[in-house]
Swiss-Prot record:
The lineage of its organism: Bacteria, Pseudomonadati, Pseudomonadota, Alphaproteobacteria, Hyphomicrobiales. Keywords: Cytoplasm, DNA-binding, Iron, Metal-binding, Repressor, Transcription, Transcription regulation, Zinc. This is Ferric uptake regulation protein. GO terms for biological process: negative regulation of DNA-templated transcription; regulation of secondary metabolite biosynthetic process. It comes from Rhizobium leguminosarum bv. viciae. PANTHER family: FERRIC UPTAKE REGULATION PROTEIN (PTHR33202:SF2), ZINC UPTAKE REGULATION PROTEIN (PTHR33202). CDD domains: Fur_like.
Length: 142
């Protein structure tokens, strides 16, 4: 999905987590994901690597990683919590409401506008999340 300076396994170890082989498998799958998988999809991918991994192990591991701040949970209005590694560089999301496709993008103009708005209201921005939802334009709308 994104370049990760340190592997999830390294981040977990730094935070004092015991890395079982099953956690390593789940961490590698998250790192290698080009999409934003939900727990059920992580489970499907995990059992292809290690058939002994249970769905409850995936749920517990995802919760552990999320609580440690090394993965981010997203709710893209499709009724599922979806996950990605916490990227080094901030990005926002554009979600296709018809297909569920998630497009990651960066916009210096949007980032600057958000900073300006926070300052105008007397705040220093420390974090934010922008998710845009839409449907593809029809050819006649272009």
């Amino acid at each position: 999905m994104t370049d990760v300076a340190k592997t999830l396994e390294e981040l977990c170890t730094e935070r004092g987590m015991r890395m079982t082989e099953q956690r390593r498998v789940i961490a590698r799958i998250l790192e290698d994901s080009e999409d934003h998988p939900d727990v059920e999809e992580l489970y499907r991918r995990s059992v292809k690597v290690d058939a002994k991994i249970s769905i409850s192990t995936v749920y517990r591991t995802v919760k552990l990683f999320e609580d440690a701040g090394i993965i981010a949970r997203h709710d893209f209005r499709d009724g599922r919590s979806r996950y990605e590694t916490v990227p080094e560089e901030h990005h926002d999301h554009l979600i296709d409401l018809k297909t569920g496709t998630v497009i990651e993008f960066r916009s210096p103009e949007i980032e600057a506008l958000q900073e300006r708005i926070a300052r105008e209201h007397g705040f220093r921005l420390v974090d934010h999340r922008l998710e845009l939802y839409g449907v593809p334009l029809k050819k006649e709308d272009l």
